[in-house]
Design a protein with these regions (language model features):
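Hydrophobic alpha-helical elements and their junctions with loops/disorder across both membrane
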Residues: 17-19, 144, 324, 346
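Short, exposed coil/turn segments at beta-strand boundaries within extracellular/luminal domains
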Residues: 394-397
Length: 415
């Protein structure tokens, strides 16, 4: 064979092999490179969006929702979102049905306030309690109002009068003489049955935008919050991340069964005049406790113990030679109050308030872990009721019976 010809054939073979190698490399490498860039280079900020689109909300608790309208039902039956679509559509349909069912029971409230400085306007929310025209709202919504106008979901309006208010719970009842036929009461639930993580719905009038609905969860339970207009606190408040803004005050916080579980009252803003994900509602069991008296008498009498205190903690326990860390440590006792009359003791020295006070560990046989536990238990009693406190005094257990009084009008906060 000619040497030149052989070299040419060899070079040609090398060229062919090189071309084949390039083609194989191209077809194998390019798809791998694209997949790798998609997985590695995609910005992290995109991931929540992808999860929101592709992940269904957790299923709602089992119950039979109110039948939605035909248009809502048609939307649910035709919606498609892949494998997770039915769950998303079902949840969306449930919420749409709940709004249609519940919104006629929610009202917007506009008030006119006259003062020495002039007149002003305010707005809030409320919900219908019964067919007699009683509406529950916040005291701070209607306090000082000279005129109150209730706006119903169908657009009709009616004037209202204040029947009763309670500063300490920030609750009020107003009444209209006539309601539209479409308006209806909202059922009351049981705030003792709700749990952290339960879904929560708020419907109201934020920033004057009536008929607004927001969704969140129960973030915490058993909060004690200031009433905002009185020196006493509201017990067992519900914390939620459902958006609550100015104008939502007095509106209902509801569960997915369509029951009122609270009355929206406050937000923790951190200085901003808007929702920051921390809202508070007065529990519906406080509503059950207070509102009947507001309707019948125009006011409510809260029980009163007459003590000051704090949670027992490690440092207080150590200072008092106690081997427990839970209880209500009593720092002060009002001498002529119910606790003083019964013989409860606070710290004997103002210079050492964490030494020598009684430590309440039980009330009527129920354990007390914090000072709020004691206050919350008393809050659902009535003046004249008798309670039995188990206390540690100098490390020794004692049982002390106390007859509760009525809250006085104080200048400073006292439990």
């Amino acid at each position: 064979m000619n040497r030149g010809f052989g070299l040419a054939i060899g070079a040609g073979c090398v060229l062919v092999i090189a071309v084949i190698a390039v083609l194989v490399f191209t077809f194998l490498w390019i798809p791998f490179r694209v997949v790798r860039e998609t997985a590695v280079e995609a910005p992290a900020t995109n991931r929540p969006v992808i999860q929101t689109v592709g992940t269904a909300l957790p299923p709602a608790p089992t119950f039979t929702p109110a039948p939605p309208s035909a248009s809502t039902a048609n939307t649910a039956s035709t919606g498609t979102n892949g494998a997770n679509g039915p769950a998303l559509v079902t949840t969306s349909n449930l919420l749409a049905g709940r709004y249609e069912q519940l919104s006629p029971g929610v009202v917007n409230i506009n008030v006119l306030v006259e003062s020495a400085e002039g007149s002003g306007q305010g707005a809030g929310s409320g919900f219908i309690l019964d067919r007699e025209g009683h509406i529950v709202t916040n005291n701070h919504v209607v306090a000082g109002a000279t005129d109150i106008v209730v706006n119903f979901a169908n657009g009709l309006q009616a004037e209202a009068e204040v029947l009763g208010v309670d500063d300490d719970s920030d609750l009020a009842v107003i009444k209209v003489e006539q309601m539209p036929e479409s308006a209806h009461p909202l059922p009351l639930g049981d705030s003792d049955l709700i749990q952290v993580g339960d879904w929560a719905i708020a419907i109201g009038n934020p920033f004057g935008l009536g008929g607004s609905m927001t969704l969140g969860i129960i973030s915490a339970l058993g909060r004690t919050i200031p009433s905002g207009v009185a020196q006493f606190s509201i017990p067992q408040a519900i914390q939620t991340d459902a958006a609550i803004n100015p104008g939502n005050s007095g509106g209902p916080l509801l569960n997915l069964d369509g029951e009122v579980i609270g009355v929206n009252a406050q937000i923790r803003t951190g200085g901003a005049n808007a929702n920051t994900g921390v809202g508070f509602a007065i529990p519906v069991n406080v509503v059950r406790h207070v509102v009947p008296s507001l309707i019948a008498n125009g006011s409510f009498q809260w029980p009163y113990l007459g003590i000051g205190g704090t949670d027992l903690n490690l440092l207080i326990a150590k200072a008092n030679n106690l081997d427990i860390q839970q209880g209500a440590y009593i720092t002060s006792v009002e001498a002529d109050g119910p606790a003083g009359a019964a013989g409860l003791r606070g710290a004997p020295s103002l210079s050492q308030p964490t030494v020598g006070g009684d430590v309440a560990t039980q009330v009527d046989g129920q354990p007390i872990a914090t000072f709020d536990d004691l206050l919350n238990y008393i809050a659902f009693k009535n003046p004249g009721d008798q309670i039995t406190l188990t206390v540690l005094r100098n490390g020794q257990p004692q049982q002390i019976a106390v007859t509760l009084g009525s809250r006085p009008d104080l200048d400073v906060q006292s439990p």
